[in-house]
Amino acid sequence: MFFVDVLWKLVPLYLFGSETKSLSATESILQIVPEAMAATSSNVLCNASESDLCRDDSAAFLLKFVAIASILLAGAAGVTIPLIGRNRRFLQTDGNLFVTAKAFAAGVILATGFVHMLAGGTEALKNPCLPDFPWSKFPFPGFFAMIAALITLFVDFMGTQYYERKQEREASESVEPFGREQSPGIVVPMIGEGTNDGKVFGEEDSGGIHIVGIHAHAAHHRHSHPPGHDSCEGHSKIDIGHAHAHGHGHGHGHGHVHGGLDAVNGARHIVVSQVLELGIVSHSIIIGLSLGVSQSPCTIRPLIAALSFHQFFEGFALGGCISQAQFRNKSATIMACFFALTTPIGIGIGTAVASSFNSHSVGALVTEGILDSLSAGILVYMALVDLIAADFLSTKMRCNFRLQIVSYVMLFLGAGLMSSLAIWA
């Protein structure tokens, strides 16, 4: 085939001459032969399956079982620790230990998106086996990542709106029976003014209620604390999670409510956990397939260590979000199992199709490149917006200098360690 390519290019050259009219026969041959050799080798590479000096099908098959067990245990442990630890004092979601561990996990997810997924998508969509048009004419990896981030923003926004309205409807329905029994001079909790644990508006831990002369239109005059009041001194009061009502003796009082923040935060945590799981699952399937179709033990061994590390801390971040969302035990268990099983299932599917799979085919490269790029956009958005910004810009972080230092160190450490794994996997 190589000689046919050379003759195919030489015959028109001698019949019609070269473009420069100055190339000799020897120069023409020296120019065409390397081009034909490069084209031939490229075609062989793109049409062939994996060819590696380290290829060993039987050893690779055994290593895939080790990978399934290791990654399954790592993912299950990572996602389970926050769910079990929410009933333990040292691992509660509002504790400093959890915040610093979550910062490390956020760094791992951020590095996964930038260094691993986006780089993998770029490598696949810039592969020489793909046709020049359109893949070499436009930066598709960054474009797909941007589209995924914008779609995630839209889903994040719409999901938050949906759950907030749902909680408002439930709150209004729960207080409606009480509204018929109250006198006109007493205000009942309006939408967004409920408190945690089913407490009535103004109820203290002792069980007493101190609603004093609050008119029905007080809901229209609710006060949010000015910036000066949102200080570290009042932070402990907000963390208590109880609402406080302050009445004025002249019967025209105004209520100060912090309970509405809990409903908003609850909706945010629900959406964050669901969108984060969607992003993690989408790239976990690709990772599992990539490992499953490989027949090289030299490739699989470092992937086992890298993916186990990656799955553990990704699972920890996801488990923390699920814990903060306060899902029911059944829903939390389903989400945790879905995360833990995704990559092993991908490895199993990849192993089943490994004999007939060509990783250099156009379809495989385009699919891998697009999904990797989309996953990168989702992970980068979730890491920066819903994990890092949500914690690092919070009052809890701002009011604790030591927590700031430790969290930043853990964030950079997680990102650095996950990035360094790109050397081997």
UniProtKB/Swiss-Prot annotation:
Its main location: plastid. The chain crosses the membrane at residues 65-85, 98-118, 138-158, 270-290, 302-322, 334-354, 370-390, 405-425. It is found in: Plastid, Chloroplast thylakoid membrane. Keywords: Chloroplast, Ion transport, Iron, Iron transport, Membrane, Plastid, Thylakoid, Transit peptide, Transmembrane, Transmembrane helix, Transport. It is a multi-pass membrane protein. It holds the Pfam family Zip. GO terms for biological process: iron ion transport; response to nematode; zinc ion transport. One of its GO terms (cellular component) is plant-type vacuole. One of its GO terms (molecular function) is iron ion transmembrane transporter activity. Residues 86-97, 159-269, 323-333, 391-404 are cytoplasmic. May play a role in the transport of iron in the plastids. This is Fe(2+) transport protein 3, chloroplastic.
